[in-house]
Structure formats: C-alpha cells, structure tokens
Swiss-Prot record:
Pfam families for the chain: Enolase_C, Enolase_N
Species: Cupriavidus pinatubonensis (strain JMP 134 / LMG 1197)
Residues that bind (2R)-2-phosphoglycerate: 163, 339, 368-369, 390
Cofactor, how bound (note): Binds a second Mg(2+) ion via substrate during catalysis.
Localization, UniProt: Cytoplasm; Secreted; Cell surface
Source organism phylogeny: Bacteria, Pseudomonadati, Pseudomonadota, Betaproteobacteria, Burkholderiales
Gene3D superfamilies associated with the record: Enolase-like C-terminal domain (3.20.20.120), Enolase-like, N-terminal domain (3.30.390.10)
Functional description taken from the UniProt entry: Catalyzes the reversible conversion of 2-phosphoglycerate (2-PG) into phosphoenolpyruvate (PEP). It is essential for the degradation of carbohydrates via glycolysis.
Protein name in UniProt: Enolase
Gene (UniProt): eno
Length: 429
C-alpha cells in the first residue's frame, strides 16, 4: 500500500505572475509527488470554480491562500492514510468532501493540485513514468501539436478577434520532427513580421501578437511563414483556429461582433464566415466556433462543417461529461478540448476523454493561458493516446516544458512510439 503520510499546499506564481496552487504529497516510502495547477483567461461559465481570496490588498484579489488552507487542513485530514494508487477512490473522496456541483467550496484549484500530486507520487512509487502509469502498456501514441503562433482576442492586446491561429505539422513521422517543423515556422514568421515592421512581442501563450487588418491577412502571413520555412501548406502543415467566440458574442442582440473587421454577424452568417475561411485556407480544426450558450449556432456550424473540419468544444463542454453527453446526443461539435482545471480531478478528466472517444469525438489535451512549469498534460496526452495536444507556441518555458517532456517520452518509448499525423482527425472525411 502506498499510504499518504503528508500533504503540503502552497501559493506559487503562474506564467502571468498570478498566484496559483502547488501541492506536495509524501508517501510512506518517502516518495513525493508535486503538482501545480494552471489558470485560464477566457473561461467557460460552467467550469469548476477556481477559488480566489478576493482580498484586494494581496495580488489584486487573486491570492489563493484559502485554497491552500483547504489543502493543509480538511483535505489533508480526509485523505491522510489513503492509498495513493487508488486514484478514483481518492478523487471521489475529494468530490464528496467538497459537496458542491462546481467545486466552489474547496476550489477546483485545490482539489486538482492534490489529485495530480497523488498520481505523480503513486507513479514514482510504482517505478513508472507518469504516462505509463496513466495508460499502461498501450500508451504509445504521440500527439500532433496545435502550435499557437499568433495570439489575438483575450490572449493579446491587438486588433484580432480570433484568439488563436495555430499550425499543426501532419506529415512528420515523429513528434521530434513535428516540433522542429513548428519551431522553424515560428522563426520564419518572426522574420516576416520584423521585415514588415510589425511587432514580434508575444502574448500569454508565446505566440506573436501583431496588429493585422483582418483574420485573412493573419492567415496569409502564416501561409508565407510555412512556405518560407520550406514546408508545404496543406500537405506538411494544416491550420487550426480557436475563435473563443463567447468573448465577442453579444447575447442581447444575438450577434457576433468582430470589432477588428467592423462586422456584426448572426450565427448563420458567422458560420458562413468560418466556412469561407475553410474554403480559402487548409483549416482542419476550429475551437469554440460559436458561443458556449449558442447551441443553435453550434448545430448550424456542425451541420455546415462537421464532416470536414474538427469542431472542438472548449467553453462549450468544459471537460464535463454531463455537458458532453448532451452535446453528443444533439450532434453538437465533433471534438472536446480537455482542460484538467475545468473539471478539477484526474478521474473526471479521464472520464471525459473516454466518453468522447466512445462517441467518435476526438479529444485535444490542452494547457491554459496561465501556465506553470508542470508538464503533466504531456503525460496525459500520451497516456490516453489522445492524439492531439494544444500547449502554446515555440517560446516561453511554461509552454516549452510540455514539448520537452514529450520529447523525453518519445525517447523513452523508442521504436514503439507512433505519430498519427493526419490520422489524428479520424472522424473527418
């Protein structure tokens, strides 16, 4: 038995300089697991609640001392002595202890830090790499990365309404090759922007954040960068978008307002707008193409593009099996974004991935805009054979830490490692 003998919660900083929760879990054998949780900028309204102190005299109210206190007192008392290898039982203990639908009492940030730290300690105790502990002997598929090389929306202070413009290397035969492709495109884009006198400052997720006149101009510039780096757009590299449409949806008027382009569009018109972009560019994936509450708009978008484009629900599904099941039943989207802090425990995270796969939906493992050096999501991506990961651009060590962990995992897997390329989109025609 891997009995838990000590738990320590602490307040640390994330990549935006805001407080977040870190937890150490010590086992009877002397083995320790440590985990730190991320935080989002554009968040879904039905996400599990991240507990903040609200004390304006500390960190502008964003302190997490209450969440840390919960770890060091009642959570510690509830799980002390439990077997760290019984992840599902431990997570259920946390959920029952919290007692709310959205984890608002203890805080999803406190609960997730403990859930992750316990898993890491148990993996260490078992002498297994974390991805192998999660996935057993069947974990061998590396993920295709969605690399966010241009940031807009809530992730940057510029004129772009769409939040993320991403490249996906699909012709590579290994993750290492895919990472090199992304890095070379990133540097080619930097040179193009610099030559045009445009900003090469980066946003929260490490992508560039220049002012473009339109989303099309941005996409055209990315195409130039791909070609400048020596790759074929549409063959070697595909494009992906995160619209984060909830951020520019005006519910009272039922319109999508693209301020950067001076457009006010109905759901149907915005679906047509996105379809037009897909006709002009090799876009294989669109995340949050409609607002989280606009299910009619989502249905319109799915009917229009769902057979040829991966339509990823982030704010829509918030890694929640109840909401995902409703979406599956109604034929909304065809993919789910998996963010561990949206739901607050590893067990519930794995349940959402499993439900998606059973329904023929893809699952994309994702970071948050406020990250830490914790690289657990890299191990989750491989451990669940998810096939796709979204963890930022090719700059900022809070993003690179995940890519570097994936390089280590691929090296550890050796000849049995596989890279899915275009087959990651197994539900598209």
């Amino acid at each position: 038995m891997s009995a838990i003998v000590d738990i320590i919660g602490r307040e640390v900083l994330d990549s935006r300089g805001n407080p977040t929760v870190e937890c150490d879990v010590l086992l009877e054998s002397g083995v320790m697991g440590r985990a730190a949780v991320p935080s989002g900028a554009s968040t879904g309204s039905r996400e599990a609640i991240e507990l903040r102190d609200g004390d304006k005299s500390r960190y502008l109210g964003k302190g997490v001392l209450k969440a840390v206190e919960h770890i060091n007192t009642e959570i510690s008392e509830a799980i002390m002595g439990l077997d760290a290898s019984e992840q599902a039982f431990l997570d259920r203990t946390l959920i029952d202890l919290d007692g709310t639908e959205n984890k608002s009492r203890l805080g999803a940030n406190a609960m997730l830090a403990v859930s992750m730290a316990v898993a890491k300690a148990a993996a260490e105790e078992a002498g297994l790499p974390l991805y192998r502990y999660f996935g057993g002997s069947g974990a061998m598929q590396m993920p295709v990365p969605m690399m966010n090389i241009v940031n807009g929306g809530a992730h940057a202070n510029n004129s772009l309404d769409i939040q993320e413009f991403m490249v996906m290397p699909v012709s590579a035969t290994s993750f290492r090759e895919a990472l090199r492709c992304g890095a070379e495109v990133f540097h080619a884009l930097k040179k193009i922007l610099a030559d045009k006198g445009m900003s090469t400052a980066v946003g929260d997720e490490g992508g560039f954040a220049p002012n473009f006149s339109s989303n099309e101009e941005c996409l055209n510039t990315i195409v130039q960068a791909v070609e400048k780096a020596g790759y074929r757009m549409g063959e070697d590299v595909l494009l992906a978008l995160d619209c984060a449409a909830s951020e520019f949806y005006h519910e009272a008027e039922d319109v999508y307002v693209l301020e950067g382009e001076g457009l006010k569009l109905s759901s149907t018109q915005f679906a047509d707008y996105l379809a037009n972009l897909c006709d002009k560019f090799p876009i294989v994936s669109i995340e949050d193409g409609m607002a989280e509450g606009d299910w009619d708009g989502w249905k319109t978008l799915t009917d229009k593009l769902g057979k040829r484009v991966q339509l990823v629900g982030d704010d829509l599904f918030v890694t929640n099996t109840k909401i995902l099941k409703e979406g599956i039943d109604k034929g909304i989207g065809n993919s789910i974004l998996i963010k561990i802090n949206q739901i607050g425990t590893l067990t519930e995270t794995f349940a959402a991935i499993e439900m998606a796969k059973r329904a023929g939906y893809t699952a994309v493992i994702s970071h948050r805009s406020g990250e830490t050096e914790d690289s657990t999501i890299a191990d989750i991506a491989v451990g669940t054979n998810a096939g796709q990961i979204k963890t930022g651009s090719l700059s900022r060590s809070d993003r690179i830490s995940k890519y570097n962990q994936l390089l280590r995992i691929e090296e550890d897997l050796g000849d049995i490692a596989s890279y899915p390329g275009k087959s990651a989109f197994y539900n598209l025609r």
